[in-house]
Design a protein with these regions (language model features):
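The catalytic-center signature of Zn2+-dependent metalloproteases
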Residues: 352-375, 437-494
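Auxiliary tRNA-acceptor-end handling modules of aminoacyl-tRNA synthetases
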Residues: 27-320, 338, 342, 347, ...
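C-terminal motif of bacterial Sec signal peptides marking the signal peptidase cleavage site
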Residues: 21-24
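Solvent-exposed, polar/charged alpha-helical surfaces in well-ordered, non-transmembrane soluble domains
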Residues: 326-333, 337, 437, 441, ...
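Sec-exported extracytoplasmic/periplasmic mature domains
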Residues: 333-344, 448-449, 453, 489, ...
Length: 817
């Protein structure tokens, strides 16, 4: 195409950037711009130097030395672009090490608009809308004015050859990409504070390249900041990173959205639709999903499996170690079976990226391509983020990240959770095939997120504990009805149960097939999202009575004992009992299993510390029964309650278990053969810390408030606050006196003092509740018992009693009734 300048405008300085934000990058073949001679004698020469290099794409990108211009076709003025900012190269430990190469730092919808001799860049929001032709649309627009992020002078007008020719405007965007624009710099306010970022050093910052593609523009920039506390090389006082800005043209016609339903788990976008006749400003939720359309709609309508017009493709990071590549690919493509439930075959693919010889312009930062990135980082994590069109929920792109050191997490947990029954997990390094299978399932979990699925924490509770010990069941069904649960390894299977290798691991389950079908199956007879609702609702009701198809969202403080993290099975007490039995078998073997000739005891110390944490986690699963409330998600046309308190008998059983396994001294954790190899001491504090955590969870104000409220409704059928306080006191004080038991008794008094003196905690008004009154009452009775101890006690016991009496008196005097 030729650029035909119509009229060059007086060159003005680039208008002030009003705030901060982003823009994109891209790539195709470079060529010198070909300019026709001006037809108008008054026309000035083009502002573009003859030496400028041009990339042709969604719009033209011109580059000369450190200057950058965008030539935007007039039809694209007013169109919506999605700008994605991503770290391309990063110093180690940026933001604590979580911000690896490929990490998305921002996304926003932008719109270019021409006003007179300037082009404005606006940030556009779709949070408030009015669908249809309702007159309120005018009010929505007037009350949701989009901010102007930057303004650019029109440097030149031109035309692109065509029939008819396309008018264009030329703007210089150099400053936008070379200055410190906070929203596209990759450094959040918290990171700037942490690393004491002072200013951008322009002399060490520059544009790497800019490329145009048919749908997007990509700009790569190197930014160097003066920083008082850089993440690495502190003496340099310098923080440098490479950012990639992707600006992709969104479809002119958005994908048909699908409305969310809280009974099926999906990541969602929320919008307030003022056009609905709901007698209120009604909130709508759209699920986030990829655009999957059948290549043969007629065959699809007949119920045949068909390929999608465009499959979902993830490319493997070229930096992925060779021995793990096949496992990563399998983790991606394991979702193919779930999409067959939605009527699609070969819907999800994993591919190697093209070589430089095959496609010199291919880039993993190009927003058109999704990747599974392998981050060389000490962080132990993985994640599956995605970028979506806020108008419809259509997922545009996703970069899954596996942090290299996450191998360490699974190496350790396979040994601790399965080593008792799994010979492949009894030495370091762990069997490579077993670790590869674990990697495969983690990748599948993160792909699930990238497909639109959130965590489903209730899924593991649908499997009976006994079934998890059955090799045939475990081999077919895994450990949970959904791979989106935090249920990683089968820790309940016992030696002799017969499970082998991958039988101990999770896998894509029946809920995942159901959720993918619910979100991705095309409903041919529906013409609008509203038309889909009765069909979607019928699919939910058809599964409503089967626990395998329940959804339980992840929360910071779950009250449903079935919706815990890292738990297994339908009986927390039994599952935790079996898990602890396995840990008791593993603990004395750690010295042998972690031994390596010529090495120290670093692995032993690490594994022992994580074993203690795993035991604490199992005990926490049981705590959740106390004051627990089952939550069964329903719509108004379904019978029954949503919230049901856990039966009294189950709560009493849980407290009895905790009295035996948590509040009694866990002597099995005190093996001197291990402790004297990793520590000079500190066992008493270690045990006290573990027991105190369980004690605090049991006597959590929100939990205690639920007990008070449950007694109001159920009376004698409820497990009461008075009963819990009595049961805990009996467990803590009815044991032989040792440094361990005395430490727990002090913790018990401290917790009661806290309940008796704090005004509020965790949203609970302690000052006016029965919790405070009963805590004070129990402290007073405890004081009487301590003061009535017989004479002749050992000095340490007498001192212990006197100390606790003094603590109680001080608390009650400082905060009298």
């Amino acid at each position: 195409m030729k650029i035909v300048p119509l009229r060059s405008l007086p060159t003005l300085a680039l208008a002030t950037l009003l705030t901060a934000l982003a823009t994109g990058c891209a790539s195709t073949e470079k060529k010198d711009p070909v300019l026709d001679e001006p037809a108008d004698d008054d026309a000035q020469e083009s502002v573009l130097p003859e030496e400028a290099e041009t990339d042709e794409g969604v719009f033209h990108v011109h580059r000369h030395e450190e200057q950058l211009w965008f030539e935007i076709p007039a039809p694209l003025l007013g169109r919506d672009f999605l700008l994605v900012s991503r770290i391309a190269r990063t110093p180690s430990d940026l933001g604590g090490g979580f911000f690896a190469a490929g990490h998305k730092t921002g996304e926003q919808v932008l719109r270019w608009e021409r006003v007179g001799e300037r082009v404005l860049l606006r940030k556009v929001s779709f949070r408030n809308v009015a669908t249809g032709d309702d007159p309120i649309q005018v009010s929505v627009e007037n009350n949701n004015f989009h901010p102007i992020l930057a303004a650019f002078d029109v440097e030149e007008e031109g035309k692109l050859e065509g029939d008819p020719p396309t008018e264009t405007v030329l703007i210089e965007v150099t400053d936008f990409f070379s200055k410190d624009i906070a929203a596209i710099s990759g450094l959040s306010a918290s990171m700037r504070k942490t690393h004491e970022v002072k200013r951008l050093d322009a002399s060490r910052s520059f544009l790497n390249h800019a490329h145009a593609y048919p749908e997007n523009v990509e700009v790569r920039q190197t930014l160097t900041f003066e920083a008082g506390n850089p993440p690495t090389d502190a003496a340099t006082k310098t923080l440098s990173l490479e950012m990639n800005q992707s600006m992709i043209l969104l479809p002119e016609e958005p994908m048909r959205p699908r409305f969310a339903d809280h009974r099926v788990g999906w990541f969602t976008l929320q919008r307030t639709n003022y056009g609905l006749d709901a007698q209120k400003s009604a909130t709508e939720e759209l699920i986030r999903r990829w655009r999957l359309e059948p290549s043969d709609p007629e065959a699809y309508a007949r119920g045949e499996l068909v390929t999608p017009v465009e499959p979902i493709v993830w490319y493997l990071d070229p930096g992925t170690p060779a021995k793990w590549r096949s496992w990563v690919k399998r983790g991606v493509e394991d979702w193919q079976a779930a999409f067959e439930s939605a009527g699609f075959k070969d819907a999800v693919l994993a591919k190697d990226p093209p070589t430089k010889e095959e496609d010199p312009d291919w880039s993993g930062e190009d927003v058109r391509y999704s990747m599974v990135r392998w981050a060389a980082s000490e962080v132990r994590n993985a994640m599956g983020p995605s970028v979506s069109d806020p108008r419809s929920g259509e997922i545009i792109e996703s970069d899954i990240v596996w942090y290299h050191n996450h191998m360490r997490s699974y190496r350790n947990r396979l040994m601790l959770e399965t080593g008792a029954a799994n010979p492949l997990a009894r030495s370091l390094p762990i069997d490579e095939e077993l670790l590869g299978e674990a990697l495969r399932q983690v990748i599948a979990h993160e792909v699930g997120h990238a497909l639109g699925l959130p965590h489903n924490m209730i899924a593991s509770a649908s499997y009976p504990v006994a079934s998890l010990r059955d090799p045939a069941f475990a081999r077919k069904m895994g450990v949970s009805a959904s791979i989106m649960d935090y249920a990683r390894q089968n820790y309940v299977a016992q030696p002799g149960d017969g499970l082998e290798g991958a039988d101990f691991l999770r896998r894509i389950g029946p809920y995942d097939h159901y959720a993918i079908e619910w979100g991705y199956r095309v409903i041919p007879e529906a013409e609008t999202p509203e038309d889909e609702k009765p069909v979607l609702d019928a699919w939910i009701l058809a599964k409503a009575d089967d626990p395998m198809y329940r959804f339980g969202a992840q929360t910071s403080s779950p009250t449903d004992p079935r919706s815990q993290t890292e738990d297994l099975g339908d009986d927390p007490v039994l599952a935790s009992s079996l898990g602890l039995q396995n840990l008791e078998r593993v603990a004395p073997k750690l010295l042998e299993w972690t031994a390596s000739e010529g090495e120290g005891y670093g692995d032993l110390e690490e594994l022992y510390g994580e074993l203690v944490g795993q035991a604490r986690r199992y005990l926490g699963h049981v705590v959740s029964l106390v004051g627990g409330v089952y939550e069964d998600l329903k719509a108004t046309d379904q019978e029954g309650r949503v919230f049901t308190p856990v039966p009294k008998e189950e709560q009493q059983r849980a407290v009895a278990f905790l009295a035996e396994r948590a509040l009694a001294t866990p002597t099995w954790l005190l093996d001197p053969e291990i402790l004297r190899r990793i520590s000079r001491g500190g066992e008493v504090d270690r045990v006290r810390s573990m027991q105190t955590r369980i004690l605090h969870q049991l006597l959590d104000p929100a939990r205690l408030r639920r007990l008070v409220e449950d007694e109001l409704e159920r009376g004698e059928e409820a497990y009461t606050l008075t009963e819990l306080l009595a049961d805990v006191q009996n467990a803590v004080w009815s044991v032989p006196s040792t440094p361990y038991s005395r430490g727990l008794q002090r913790a018990h008094v401290e917790r009661l003092v806290w309940l008796a003196t704090e005004e509020s905690a965790g949203g609970v008004d302690l000052d006016t509740s029965d919790i405070r009154a009963l805590a004070r009452w129990q402290l007073e009775r405890m004081k009487e018992l301590l003061e009535s101890q017989p004479d002749g006690l050992a000095p340490v016991l007498e001192a212990h009693a006197a100390d606790l009496v003094a603590r109680i008196e001080h608390a009650l005097e400082e905060r009298p009734d």
